[in-house]
Amino acid sequence: MGKEKIHINIVVIGHVDSGKSTTTGHLIYKCGGIDKRTIEKFEKEAAEMGKGSFKYAWVLDKLKAERERGITIDISLWKFETGKYYITIIDAPGHRDFIKNMITGTSQADCAVLIVAGGVGEFEAGISKNGQTREHALLAFTLGVKQLIIGVNKMDSTEPPFSQKRFEEITKEVSAYIKKIGYNPATVPFVPISGWHGDNMLEASTNMPWFKGWKIERKEGNASGITLLEALDCIIPPQRPTNKPLRLPLQDVYKIGGIGTVPVGRVETGVLKPGMIVTFAPSNVTTEVKSVEMHHEALVEALPGDNVGFNVKNISVKDIRRGNVAGDSKNDPPMQAGSFTAQVIILNHPGQISAGYAPVLDCHTAHIACKFAELKQKIDRRSGKKLEDDPKFLKSGDAAIVEMIPGKPMCVETFSDYPPLGRFAVRDMRQTVAVGVIKGVDKKLASSGKVTKSAAKAGKK
Protein backbone atom coordinates (compact mmCIF):
# COMPACT_ATOMS: atom_id res chain seq x y z
CA MET A 1 0.00 0.00 0.00
CA GLY A 2 2.68 2.50 0.98
CA LYS A 3 1.72 6.00 2.03
CA GLU A 4 -1.94 6.80 1.53
CA LYS A 5 -2.67 9.31 -1.21
CA ILE A 6 -3.78 12.84 -0.37
CA HIS A 7 -7.51 13.52 -0.59
CA ILE A 8 -8.64 16.35 -2.85
CA ASN A 9 -12.17 17.71 -3.37
CA ILE A 10 -13.30 19.02 -6.73
CA VAL A 11 -16.51 20.57 -7.96
CA VAL A 12 -17.53 20.14 -11.61
CA ILE A 13 -19.22 23.16 -13.15
CA GLY A 14 -20.53 24.26 -16.53
CA HIS A 15 -23.64 24.78 -18.63
CA VAL A 16 -26.49 22.28 -18.67
CA ASP A 17 -25.54 20.46 -21.86
CA SER A 18 -21.78 20.83 -21.68
CA GLY A 19 -21.35 17.12 -20.96
CA LYS A 20 -20.41 17.46 -17.27
CA SER A 21 -22.19 14.24 -16.36
CA THR A 22 -20.64 12.23 -19.14
CA THR A 23 -17.16 13.57 -18.41
CA THR A 24 -17.47 13.02 -14.67
CA GLY A 25 -19.10 9.64 -15.20
CA HIS A 26 -16.20 8.65 -17.47
CA LEU A 27 -13.60 9.49 -14.80
CA ILE A 28 -15.47 7.67 -12.05
CA TYR A 29 -16.06 4.78 -14.43
CA LYS A 30 -12.47 4.38 -15.53
CA CYS A 31 -10.54 5.29 -12.37
CA GLY A 32 -13.13 5.11 -9.73
CA GLY A 33 -14.88 3.45 -6.91
CA ILE A 34 -17.64 1.81 -8.91
CA ASP A 35 -17.27 -1.93 -9.01
CA LYS A 36 -17.66 -3.91 -12.23
CA ARG A 37 -20.98 -5.44 -11.14
CA THR A 38 -22.63 -2.06 -10.64
CA ILE A 39 -21.30 -0.86 -13.97
CA GLU A 40 -22.64 -3.91 -15.79
CA LYS A 41 -26.01 -3.42 -14.12
CA PHE A 42 -26.09 0.25 -15.17
CA GLU A 43 -25.05 -0.63 -18.74
CA LYS A 44 -27.77 -3.23 -19.03
CA GLU A 45 -30.40 -0.78 -17.72
CA ALA A 46 -29.17 1.97 -20.01
CA ALA A 47 -29.31 -0.36 -23.03
CA GLU A 48 -32.81 -1.59 -22.11
CA MET A 49 -34.00 1.98 -21.94
CA GLY A 50 -32.40 2.77 -25.26
CA LYS A 51 -29.88 5.03 -23.57
CA GLY A 52 -26.81 3.08 -24.58
CA SER A 53 -25.07 6.17 -25.88
CA PHE A 54 -25.56 7.70 -22.50
CA LYS A 55 -23.80 5.20 -20.29
CA TYR A 56 -21.30 7.46 -18.51
CA ALA A 57 -23.91 10.09 -17.74
CA TRP A 58 -26.24 7.25 -16.78
CA VAL A 59 -23.80 6.20 -14.08
CA LEU A 60 -23.98 9.71 -12.70
CA ASP A 61 -27.74 9.96 -13.10
CA LYS A 62 -28.22 6.79 -11.08
CA LEU A 63 -25.99 8.17 -8.35
CA LYS A 64 -27.75 11.54 -8.44
CA ALA A 65 -31.22 10.03 -8.26
CA GLU A 66 -30.18 8.09 -5.19
CA ARG A 67 -28.69 11.22 -3.65
CA GLU A 68 -31.85 13.21 -4.35
CA ARG A 69 -34.03 10.57 -2.75
CA GLY A 70 -31.90 10.98 0.32
CA ILE A 71 -30.45 7.50 0.12
CA THR A 72 -26.99 7.81 1.53
CA ILE A 73 -25.18 6.19 -1.26
CA ASP A 74 -21.80 4.77 -0.82
CA ILE A 75 -19.75 7.91 -1.11
CA SER A 76 -16.90 5.96 -2.74
CA LEU A 77 -19.02 6.09 -5.86
CA TRP A 78 -18.13 9.74 -6.21
CA LYS A 79 -14.42 9.12 -5.89
CA PHE A 80 -11.71 8.33 -8.37
CA GLU A 81 -7.92 8.10 -8.28
CA THR A 82 -5.14 9.86 -10.10
CA GLY A 83 -1.45 9.02 -9.77
CA LYS A 84 -1.10 11.26 -6.71
CA TYR A 85 -4.58 11.83 -5.30
CA TYR A 86 -7.86 10.38 -4.21
CA ILE A 87 -10.36 12.80 -5.70
CA THR A 88 -13.91 13.25 -4.43
CA ILE A 89 -16.49 15.07 -6.51
CA ILE A 90 -18.29 17.00 -3.83
CA ASP A 91 -21.10 18.14 -6.02
CA ALA A 92 -22.29 18.09 -9.55
CA PRO A 93 -24.49 20.93 -10.70
CA GLY A 94 -27.83 20.15 -12.16
CA HIS A 95 -28.55 19.05 -8.66
CA ARG A 96 -31.32 21.46 -7.50
CA ASP A 97 -29.47 22.73 -4.49
CA PHE A 98 -26.11 22.96 -6.19
CA ILE A 99 -25.50 26.62 -5.40
CA LYS A 100 -26.63 26.24 -1.81
CA ASN A 101 -24.49 23.12 -1.43
CA MET A 102 -21.51 24.83 -2.93
CA ILE A 103 -21.73 27.47 -0.22
CA THR A 104 -22.86 25.71 2.91
CA GLY A 105 -21.22 22.77 1.22
CA THR A 106 -20.12 19.80 3.16
CA SER A 107 -16.68 20.88 2.19
CA GLN A 108 -14.72 23.45 0.33
CA ALA A 109 -13.63 22.44 -3.15
CA ASP A 110 -9.87 22.56 -3.72
CA CYS A 111 -10.35 22.98 -7.45
CA ALA A 112 -13.18 23.64 -9.90
CA VAL A 113 -13.32 21.78 -13.20
CA LEU A 114 -15.20 23.88 -15.74
CA ILE A 115 -16.56 21.92 -18.70
CA VAL A 116 -17.43 23.96 -21.80
CA ALA A 117 -18.96 22.39 -24.90
CA GLY A 118 -17.00 22.83 -28.11
CA GLY A 119 -19.86 21.80 -30.41
CA VAL A 120 -21.29 24.20 -32.99
CA GLY A 121 -23.36 26.86 -31.21
CA GLU A 122 -23.09 25.06 -27.86
CA PHE A 123 -20.20 27.05 -26.47
CA GLU A 124 -21.93 30.30 -27.37
CA ALA A 125 -25.12 29.24 -25.54
CA GLY A 126 -23.21 28.35 -22.38
CA ILE A 127 -21.20 31.53 -22.16
CA SER A 128 -24.01 33.87 -23.28
CA LYS A 129 -25.34 36.45 -20.85
CA ASN A 130 -27.78 34.02 -19.24
CA GLY A 131 -25.72 30.87 -19.62
CA GLN A 132 -24.68 29.11 -16.41
CA THR A 133 -20.99 28.93 -17.30
CA ARG A 134 -20.42 32.50 -16.16
CA GLU A 135 -22.43 32.22 -12.97
CA HIS A 136 -20.77 28.99 -11.88
CA ALA A 137 -17.27 30.31 -12.52
CA LEU A 138 -18.00 33.56 -10.70
CA LEU A 139 -19.45 31.62 -7.77
CA ALA A 140 -16.45 29.34 -7.55
CA PHE A 141 -14.10 32.33 -7.44
CA THR A 142 -16.22 34.30 -4.95
CA LEU A 143 -16.35 31.29 -2.65
CA GLY A 144 -12.61 30.92 -2.56
CA VAL A 145 -12.04 28.09 -5.05
CA LYS A 146 -8.79 29.46 -6.41
CA GLN A 147 -7.71 26.61 -8.72
CA LEU A 148 -9.40 25.99 -12.02
CA ILE A 149 -9.12 23.42 -14.83
CA ILE A 150 -10.99 23.80 -18.11
CA GLY A 151 -12.14 20.90 -20.24
CA VAL A 152 -13.20 21.91 -23.75
CA ASN A 153 -15.59 19.02 -24.33
CA LYS A 154 -17.32 17.43 -27.34
CA MET A 155 -14.29 18.03 -29.55
CA ASP A 156 -15.69 15.17 -31.67
CA SER A 157 -18.64 17.36 -32.68
CA THR A 158 -16.82 20.51 -33.76
CA GLU A 159 -16.91 21.56 -37.43
CA PRO A 160 -14.76 19.81 -38.74
CA PRO A 161 -14.38 17.25 -35.91
CA PHE A 162 -11.43 17.80 -33.56
CA SER A 163 -10.85 21.31 -34.89
CA GLN A 164 -7.74 23.07 -33.64
CA LYS A 165 -9.16 26.43 -34.72
CA ARG A 166 -12.31 25.92 -32.63
CA PHE A 167 -10.28 24.88 -29.57
CA GLU A 168 -8.07 27.96 -29.84
CA GLU A 169 -11.06 30.26 -30.35
CA ILE A 170 -12.76 28.90 -27.21
CA THR A 171 -9.55 29.00 -25.18
CA LYS A 172 -9.10 32.64 -26.10
CA GLU A 173 -12.65 33.63 -25.17
CA VAL A 174 -12.78 31.64 -21.91
CA SER A 175 -9.37 33.01 -20.89
CA ALA A 176 -10.63 36.57 -21.30
CA TYR A 177 -13.75 35.74 -19.34
CA ILE A 178 -12.09 34.01 -16.37
CA LYS A 179 -9.53 36.80 -16.22
CA LYS A 180 -12.37 39.28 -15.71
CA ILE A 181 -13.62 37.19 -12.81
CA GLY A 182 -10.22 37.12 -11.14
CA TYR A 183 -8.50 33.91 -12.26
CA ASN A 184 -5.08 34.13 -13.91
CA PRO A 185 -5.35 32.16 -17.20
CA ALA A 186 -1.61 31.36 -17.10
CA THR A 187 -2.33 29.07 -14.13
CA VAL A 188 -5.29 27.31 -15.78
CA PRO A 189 -4.87 24.18 -17.94
CA PHE A 190 -7.13 24.07 -21.04
CA VAL A 191 -7.65 20.49 -22.24
CA PRO A 192 -9.51 19.55 -25.45
CA ILE A 193 -11.51 16.41 -24.61
CA SER A 194 -14.34 14.13 -25.54
CA GLY A 195 -15.95 12.90 -22.34
CA TRP A 196 -17.89 10.39 -24.40
CA HIS A 197 -15.17 8.95 -26.67
CA GLY A 198 -12.46 9.42 -24.06
CA ASP A 199 -10.11 11.66 -26.06
CA ASN A 200 -7.48 13.25 -23.78
CA MET A 201 -9.35 12.05 -20.71
CA LEU A 202 -6.92 9.40 -19.43
CA GLU A 203 -4.67 9.03 -22.42
CA ALA A 204 -3.51 11.29 -25.22
CA SER A 205 -5.90 11.39 -28.16
CA THR A 206 -4.78 10.26 -31.60
CA ASN A 207 -7.50 12.47 -33.10
CA MET A 208 -5.76 15.71 -32.16
CA PRO A 209 -2.12 15.40 -33.21
CA TRP A 210 -1.99 19.22 -33.31
CA PHE A 211 -2.46 19.40 -29.52
CA LYS A 212 1.00 19.58 -27.99
CA GLY A 213 -0.34 19.66 -24.42
CA TRP A 214 -1.21 22.25 -21.80
CA LYS A 215 1.32 24.26 -19.76
CA ILE A 216 0.72 26.27 -16.61
CA GLU A 217 2.92 28.69 -14.70
CA ARG A 218 2.48 29.35 -11.01
CA LYS A 219 4.62 30.26 -8.06
CA GLU A 220 4.22 26.78 -6.53
CA GLY A 221 5.86 25.31 -9.60
CA ASN A 222 5.09 25.02 -13.30
CA ALA A 223 3.39 21.98 -14.77
CA SER A 224 2.50 20.52 -18.15
CA GLY A 225 0.72 17.52 -19.55
CA ILE A 226 -1.76 16.38 -22.16
CA THR A 227 -4.76 14.76 -20.49
CA LEU A 228 -7.46 15.87 -18.09
CA LEU A 229 -6.29 13.24 -15.61
CA GLU A 230 -2.78 14.75 -15.65
CA ALA A 231 -4.25 18.20 -15.05
CA LEU A 232 -6.10 16.85 -12.00
CA ASP A 233 -2.85 15.34 -10.83
CA CYS A 234 -1.30 18.83 -10.82
CA ILE A 235 -3.79 20.35 -8.37
CA ILE A 236 -1.94 21.95 -5.45
CA PRO A 237 -3.06 20.15 -2.29
CA PRO A 238 -4.76 22.34 0.29
CA GLN A 239 -3.33 23.32 3.64
CA ARG A 240 -5.86 21.94 6.09
CA PRO A 241 -6.51 24.53 8.82
CA THR A 242 -5.41 22.54 11.89
CA ASN A 243 -3.53 25.49 13.37
CA LYS A 244 -6.63 27.70 13.68
CA PRO A 245 -8.88 27.67 16.76
CA LEU A 246 -11.57 24.99 16.77
CA ARG A 247 -14.83 25.57 14.89
CA LEU A 248 -17.32 22.73 14.61
CA PRO A 249 -20.84 23.56 13.37
CA LEU A 250 -23.38 21.05 14.70
CA GLN A 251 -25.39 19.04 12.18
CA ASP A 252 -27.45 17.19 14.78
CA VAL A 253 -27.65 16.50 18.49
CA TYR A 254 -28.54 12.99 19.63
CA LYS A 255 -29.53 11.59 22.97
CA ILE A 256 -28.07 8.14 23.32
CA GLY A 257 -29.19 5.90 26.15
CA GLY A 258 -26.43 5.08 28.62
CA ILE A 259 -24.10 7.64 27.03
CA GLY A 260 -25.92 10.95 27.12
CA THR A 261 -25.88 13.91 24.76
CA VAL A 262 -23.92 13.47 21.54
CA PRO A 263 -23.54 16.44 19.18
CA VAL A 264 -22.50 15.53 15.64
CA GLY A 265 -20.77 17.70 13.05
CA ARG A 266 -17.76 18.31 10.89
CA VAL A 267 -14.58 19.87 12.23
CA GLU A 268 -14.06 22.88 9.95
CA THR A 269 -10.94 24.33 11.60
CA GLY A 270 -8.72 23.37 14.52
CA VAL A 271 -8.60 20.13 16.47
CA LEU A 272 -11.14 18.50 18.79
CA LYS A 273 -9.82 16.27 21.58
CA PRO A 274 -11.33 14.42 24.53
CA GLY A 275 -10.86 16.41 27.76
CA MET A 276 -11.25 19.76 25.99
CA ILE A 277 -13.57 22.38 27.44
CA VAL A 278 -15.83 23.53 24.62
CA THR A 279 -18.22 26.45 24.35
CA PHE A 280 -21.27 26.29 22.10
CA ALA A 281 -22.45 29.53 20.48
CA PRO A 282 -24.94 31.13 20.31
CA SER A 283 -26.38 28.91 23.10
CA ASN A 284 -23.50 30.01 25.30
CA VAL A 285 -23.08 26.66 27.03
CA THR A 286 -19.66 25.42 28.19
CA THR A 287 -18.81 21.82 29.02
CA GLU A 288 -16.19 19.10 28.88
CA VAL A 289 -15.77 16.70 25.94
CA LYS A 290 -15.71 13.16 27.28
CA SER A 291 -14.98 11.26 24.08
CA VAL A 292 -14.80 11.75 20.32
CA GLU A 293 -15.87 9.13 17.78
CA MET A 294 -15.77 8.70 14.03
CA HIS A 295 -17.38 5.68 12.32
CA HIS A 296 -17.85 4.10 15.77
CA GLU A 297 -14.18 4.32 16.64
CA ALA A 298 -12.79 6.45 19.46
CA LEU A 299 -10.38 9.16 18.32
CA VAL A 300 -7.57 10.85 20.24
CA GLU A 301 -8.13 13.89 18.02
CA ALA A 302 -10.45 14.97 15.23
CA LEU A 303 -9.04 17.14 12.42
CA PRO A 304 -10.57 19.43 9.80
CA GLY A 305 -12.77 17.44 7.45
CA ASP A 306 -13.62 14.77 10.02
CA ASN A 307 -17.31 14.12 10.63
CA VAL A 308 -17.52 13.20 14.28
CA GLY A 309 -19.83 12.60 17.19
CA PHE A 310 -18.64 13.67 20.62
CA ASN A 311 -20.05 13.05 24.04
CA VAL A 312 -20.52 16.04 26.35
CA LYS A 313 -21.17 16.04 30.08
CA ASN A 314 -24.26 17.29 31.89
CA ILE A 315 -25.89 18.95 28.94
CA SER A 316 -29.37 18.17 27.79
CA VAL A 317 -30.47 17.90 24.20
CA LYS A 318 -32.46 21.09 24.80
CA ASP A 319 -29.32 23.15 25.50
CA ILE A 320 -27.76 22.88 22.04
CA ARG A 321 -29.03 22.34 18.51
CA ARG A 322 -28.19 22.15 14.81
CA GLY A 323 -26.59 25.41 13.69
CA ASN A 324 -24.74 25.91 16.98
CA VAL A 325 -20.96 26.08 16.71
CA ALA A 326 -18.56 24.39 19.13
CA GLY A 327 -15.14 25.90 19.86
CA ASP A 328 -12.36 25.80 22.45
CA SER A 329 -13.44 27.84 25.48
CA LYS A 330 -9.83 28.98 26.00
CA ASN A 331 -8.88 29.81 22.41
CA ASP A 332 -11.02 32.40 20.61
CA PRO A 333 -14.32 30.76 21.61
CA PRO A 334 -17.23 31.22 19.19
CA MET A 335 -19.76 33.92 20.05
CA GLN A 336 -23.18 35.07 19.00
CA ALA A 337 -23.25 37.63 16.18
CA GLY A 338 -25.29 40.74 16.95
CA SER A 339 -24.94 41.85 13.34
CA PHE A 340 -22.49 41.39 10.49
CA THR A 341 -21.30 43.12 7.33
CA ALA A 342 -21.22 41.09 4.15
CA GLN A 343 -20.43 41.40 0.49
CA VAL A 344 -23.38 39.91 -1.40
CA ILE A 345 -23.98 39.14 -5.06
CA ILE A 346 -27.63 39.04 -6.14
CA LEU A 347 -28.00 36.08 -8.51
CA ASN A 348 -31.66 35.82 -9.40
CA HIS A 349 -34.26 37.88 -7.66
CA PRO A 350 -37.32 38.81 -9.72
CA GLY A 351 -37.78 42.21 -8.08
CA GLN A 352 -35.80 44.73 -6.13
CA ILE A 353 -34.22 44.15 -2.75
CA SER A 354 -34.29 47.05 -0.35
CA ALA A 355 -33.43 47.55 3.33
CA GLY A 356 -35.76 45.51 5.51
CA TYR A 357 -35.73 42.43 3.25
CA ALA A 358 -35.53 39.37 5.53
CA PRO A 359 -34.88 36.09 3.69
CA VAL A 360 -33.44 32.89 5.15
CA LEU A 361 -29.66 32.54 5.25
CA ASP A 362 -27.94 29.18 5.01
CA CYS A 363 -24.53 29.56 6.61
CA HIS A 364 -22.60 26.40 7.65
CA THR A 365 -25.38 24.33 9.29
CA ALA A 366 -27.45 27.32 10.45
CA HIS A 367 -30.69 28.16 8.64
CA ILE A 368 -31.92 31.48 10.00
CA ALA A 369 -33.85 34.52 8.74
CA CYS A 370 -31.65 37.62 8.60
CA LYS A 371 -32.61 41.17 7.81
CA PHE A 372 -30.82 43.34 5.25
CA ALA A 373 -30.71 46.19 7.77
CA GLU A 374 -28.73 48.64 5.67
CA LEU A 375 -27.53 48.70 2.06
CA LYS A 376 -24.17 50.41 2.53
CA GLN A 377 -22.71 50.52 -0.96
CA LYS A 378 -23.08 49.04 -4.38
CA ILE A 379 -19.75 47.73 -5.68
CA ASP A 380 -18.25 46.39 -8.88
CA ARG A 381 -18.46 42.64 -8.43
CA ARG A 382 -15.13 41.97 -10.11
CA SER A 383 -12.86 44.65 -8.67
CA GLY A 384 -14.78 45.34 -5.45
CA LYS A 385 -14.56 49.09 -6.17
CA LYS A 386 -17.36 51.28 -4.83
CA LEU A 387 -19.97 52.35 -7.39
CA GLU A 388 -22.45 54.20 -5.14
CA ASP A 389 -23.17 54.84 -1.46
CA ASP A 390 -26.48 53.95 0.21
CA PRO A 391 -28.20 52.46 -2.84
CA LYS A 392 -32.01 52.47 -2.55
CA PHE A 393 -32.32 48.93 -3.86
CA LEU A 394 -30.42 45.98 -5.37
CA LYS A 395 -31.40 43.84 -8.34
CA SER A 396 -30.10 40.70 -10.06
CA GLY A 397 -26.45 41.02 -11.04
CA ASP A 398 -25.66 43.65 -8.40
CA ALA A 399 -22.95 43.27 -5.78
CA ALA A 400 -23.12 45.24 -2.55
CA ILE A 401 -21.85 45.66 0.98
CA VAL A 402 -24.75 45.20 3.39
CA GLU A 403 -25.31 45.20 7.13
CA MET A 404 -27.29 42.15 8.26
CA ILE A 405 -29.08 41.37 11.52
CA PRO A 406 -30.01 37.77 12.39
CA GLY A 407 -33.64 37.26 13.42
CA LYS A 408 -32.61 34.63 15.98
CA PRO A 409 -29.32 34.04 17.79
CA MET A 410 -26.70 32.92 15.28
CA CYS A 411 -22.95 32.30 15.19
CA VAL A 412 -21.01 33.34 12.08
CA GLU A 413 -17.40 34.39 11.45
CA THR A 414 -15.55 36.48 8.89
CA PHE A 415 -14.61 34.67 5.70
CA SER A 416 -10.96 35.62 6.18
CA ASP A 417 -10.76 34.05 9.67
CA TYR A 418 -12.93 30.96 9.22
CA PRO A 419 -13.94 30.50 5.55
CA PRO A 420 -16.57 27.77 6.04
CA LEU A 421 -18.39 29.94 8.61
CA GLY A 422 -18.06 33.08 6.55
CA ARG A 423 -19.95 32.29 3.35
CA PHE A 424 -23.70 31.99 2.98
CA ALA A 425 -26.56 31.46 0.56
CA VAL A 426 -29.65 33.65 0.64
CA ARG A 427 -32.75 31.54 0.03
CA ASP A 428 -36.14 32.87 -0.96
CA MET A 429 -38.96 31.50 -3.12
CA ARG A 430 -37.31 28.06 -2.97
CA GLN A 431 -34.17 29.18 -4.73
CA THR A 432 -30.82 30.78 -4.03
CA VAL A 433 -31.35 34.48 -4.70
CA ALA A 434 -27.92 35.67 -3.53
CA VAL A 435 -24.59 34.54 -2.12
CA GLY A 436 -22.37 36.37 0.29
CA VAL A 437 -19.11 36.42 2.16
CA ILE A 438 -18.85 37.96 5.60
CA LYS A 439 -16.41 40.85 5.98
CA GLY A 440 -16.96 41.81 9.62
CA VAL A 441 -18.88 40.52 12.65
CA ASP A 442 -20.16 42.52 15.57
CA LYS A 443 -19.94 39.93 18.34
CA LYS A 444 -22.46 40.05 21.11
CA LEU A 445 -21.10 39.59 24.61
CA ALA A 446 -23.65 37.18 25.97
CA SER A 447 -24.68 37.30 29.59
CA SER A 448 -22.98 34.56 31.58
CA GLY A 449 -24.14 31.27 30.13
CA LYS A 450 -24.40 27.77 31.48
CA VAL A 451 -21.10 26.24 32.58
CA THR A 452 -21.28 22.63 33.72
CA LYS A 453 -19.56 21.55 36.92
CA SER A 454 -17.03 19.40 35.10
CA ALA A 455 -16.10 22.34 32.88
CA ALA A 456 -15.70 24.66 35.86
CA LYS A 457 -13.57 22.07 37.63
CA ALA A 458 -11.42 21.34 34.58
CA GLY A 459 -11.10 25.07 33.95
CA LYS A 460 -9.49 25.56 37.35
CA LYS A 461 -6.80 22.97 36.71
Curated annotation (Swiss-Prot):
Annotated spans, G2: 70-74
Stretches the record annotates as G4: 153-156
Name of protein: Elongation factor 1-alpha, oocyte form
HAMAP family per UniProt: EF_Tu_A
Tissue: Oocyte.
GO BP terms in the entry: translation; translational elongation
Role played: This protein promotes the GTP-dependent binding of aminoacyl-tRNA to the A-site of ribosomes during protein biosynthesis.
Modified residues (N,N,N-trimethylglycine): 2
GO MF assignments: GTP binding; GTPase activity; translation elongation factor activity
Membership in a protein family: Belongs to the TRAFAC class translation factor GTPase superfamily. Classic translation factor GTPase family. EF-Tu/EF-1A subfamily.
Modified residues (5-glutamyl glycerylphosphorylethanolamine): 301, 374
Keyword entries, A-Z: Cytoplasm, Elongation factor, GTP-binding, Methylation, Nucleotide-binding, Phosphoprotein, Protein biosynthesis
Region entry G1, spans: 14-21
Record bears the keyword Cell inner membrane: no
UniProt-annotated stretches for the region G3: 91-94
Binding site for GTP: 14-21, 91-95, 153-156
Region called G5, residue ranges: 194-196
Domain spans labelled tr-type G: 5-242
Species: Xenopus laevis
A cellular-component GO term for this protein: cytoplasm
SUPFAM superfamilies in the cross-refs: EF-Tu/eEF-1alpha/eIF2-gamma C-terminal domain (SSF50465), P-loop containing nucleoside triphosphate hydrolases (SSF52540), Translation proteins (SSF50447)
Subcellular compartments: Cytoplasm
